[in-house]
A protein has these predicted regions:
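Single conserved hydrophobic/aromatic residue that forms the stacking wall/gate
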Residues: 1-8, 13
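Short, flexible active-site loop motifs that bind/organize anionic cofactors or intermediates
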Residues: 1-2, 312, 364
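Structured loop/turn residues at beta-strand edges in well-structured enzyme cores
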Residues: 7, 24, 358
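Conserved ATP-driven motor cores of ASCE-family P-loop NTPases powering translocation/secretion/packaging/pilus
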Residues: 326-328, 332-431
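Glycine-centered flexibility sites
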Residues: 5-8, 33-38, 382
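C-terminal alpha-helical "lid" subdomain
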Residues: 446-448
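P-loop NTPase motor domains
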Residues: 13-15, 22-334, 347-352, 420-441, ...
Length: 523
């Protein structure tokens, strides 16, 4: 079964045929592609046409969804988009608190992981006293809501802290302190006196702390908590995060592969940063569950591999979970394709530590626009040997030429591509580096110049998609006459056996795609 990341193409020296470079290894891909360099046209769109298994892809402009969603749906995928600020009802909804495993030993850990991403959206650390205290408060508040409140969501948490029905703050903490989170006592919780209790111990402990600390400190903690929850006070964000049409575990465990397009629009992407960081971190955490040993091999608990295709990766700020995950998520069926503009952008976030670069087995470089990236690429590409000749002419005794002529030949090393050559790299070209192999000098793919890709990109995207966790079918949207005519035109072309085969197999048999691990150095 072929499920490939398409990263470029190269000319076969033997017969001058174009071969597509694909990567189906369990390792990760890092791309250096400056703005307006054609990364969508040459990397993202082709990969979405060729990757057969589950995928979650960042899609700020929603162009990936519009160009590839219908093709992936026709190929048997469950397709949807999560657009936190969507107002037209087309977005799937995702409530992060639904990821908390209630009535299990994991509930506290799940709540802490969620709230850590909320209180530290800039990845500055938890050293600040009020930040760490608000983390403690929000963790308890999340647990209280999933066990006892009707609106068990992050918007519900935000509303709780600002609820005008509480005459005093003390009433807020008393409600948490006396709530019955486990009415049947099935969890075996005990209070500080070792007596059975129906109130979650973490919730009770935090409520007591909030009641006992000085008023000024309590006010600062509460203000910090309200501030970090401010995003979820937006009615649009609240509407799209109050319930769940999918859980992140569904991406790898459904009967059918899932294609999920994450759409933090250009207008809202900065303020959506806490939600974006939370979303990606939960995908990793909830899909790296313990594996089982079967017949002498460790087997992951998933039905489909997952490609995490994240464009403008450094814009998420420093995400230590992704930095660390590069070393282990491949064993859980997760493959990452991280795209950044250049090395400078990556180093501004992660410093000189090159763990991101080192953690990606394949690196793809388009022509850089800054010298730091060009210098690093010069080092990565290595050296070659060039032959040089020097001629010297000896003079006769009276100083006239005409004596002996000698030729000296020597070999010297030089960079295979210098900084200047990198900076002048053609807009049509790219270079792929594969660990422990020579680099490949290739050509960029242009999806619209590949007939099948061009036809697929014209398929009209789904206006709405059936939720993974709700059997109710979405209402169809009105279709214009022009759009209906285009759909009929494309539908006719899809009726041919060849085209239907292409759609059904997602390129599995149509193209002879060269595996990228079969490499050749510069010719």
């Amino acid at each position: 079964e072929i499920a490939s990341c398409l990263v470029g193409s190269e000319m076969c020296i033997r017969d001058s045929a174009l071969q597509y470079l694909r990567d189906n290894a369990p390792t990760h891909v890092l791309v250096f592609a400056p703005t307006r360099s054609g990364k969508g046209r040459g990397l993202i769109i082709p990969t979405l046409f060729a990757w057969k298994q589950s995928v979650v892809v960042s899609d700020q402009k929603e162009e990936n969804y519009k160009l590839t969603a219908e093709m992936r749906r026709r190929a048997g995928q469950r397709v949807g988009k999560f657009a936190p600020t969507s107002s037209d009802g087309s977005s799937w909804k995702w409530n992060a608190l639904d990821e908390i495993r209630k009535f299990s030993p994991r509930d506290v850990g799940d709540a802490q992981n969620i709230c850590q991403m909320i209180v530290d959206p800039e990845a500055k650390g938890m050293e600040d006293h009020f930040v760490s205290m608000s983390w403690m408060l929000l963790t308890a508040l999340a647990l209280h809501h999933v066990y006892a409140e009707k609106d068990a969501s992050i918007p519900g948490m935000a509303m709780y802290l600002s609820d005008p029905n509480f005459e005093t703050e003390a009433q807020m903490w008393q409600r948490m302190l006396t709530a019955e989170h486990d009415p049947e006592l099935k969890m075996g919780w005990v209070d500080t006196s070792d007596r059975p209790t129906k109130t979650h111990p973490v919730v009770a402990s935090t409520a007591k702390t909030m009641l006992s600390i000085p008023d000024e400190e309590r006010g600062s903690v509460l203000t910090t908590a309200k501030r970090v929850l401010g995003l979820w006070m937006d009615p649009l964000v609240a509407a799209n995060t109050r319930s769940s049409d999918f859980l992140v575990r569904d991406l790898m465990t459904m009967d059918q592969p899932v294609s999920l397009y994450y759409v933090p629009t250009e207008e809202d992407k900065d303020r959506l940063l806490p939600l974006s960081r939370l979303f990606y971190s939960m995908i990793i955490r909830r899909n790296t569950v313990p594996m089982e040993a079967i017949d002498g091999r460790m087997v992951g608990g998933y039905n489909h591999r997952l490609l995490m295709l994240i464009d403008e990766f450094p814009a998420l700020r420093k995400m230590e979970i992704i930095q660390d995950a590069l070393s282990y998520v491949a064993g859980y069926g997760i493959k990452m394709m991280l795209i950044c503009q250049d090395l400078r952008q990556l180093q501004q976030v992660y410093g000189d530590d090159e763990s991101i670069v080192a953690g990606c087995h394949i690196r793809v470089a388009y022509g850089p626009t800054d010298e730091r990236t060009a210098k690093r690429l010069e080092e990565m590409v290595g050296e070659t040997t060039v032959a040089e000749e020097e001629e010297s002419v000896s003079a006769n005794r009276v100083g006239m030429s005409g004596g002996n002529v000698s030729t000296t030949r020597r070999k010297t090393g030089r960079a295979l591509m210098t900084v200047g050559e990198w900076m002048a790299l053609s807009a049509e070209d790219m270079v792929a580096f594969v660990a422990n192999n020579p680099p490949i000098y290739g050509r960029k793919i242009k999806y619209d110049e590949i007939p099948a890709f061009a036809a697929w990109s014209k398929l009209q995207p789904p206006a709405a998609n059936e939720p993974l966790r709700n059997s109710a079918a979405p209402a169809p949207r009105p279709v214009s006459k022009a759009e209906e005519a285009l759909n009929q035109e494309i539908a006719v072309s899809q009726l041919s056996p060849d085209e239907q085969k292409l759609v059904n197999t997602l390129l599995a048999d149509h193209f002879t795609l060269q595996e990228i691990k079969s490499v050749r150095a510069f010719g």
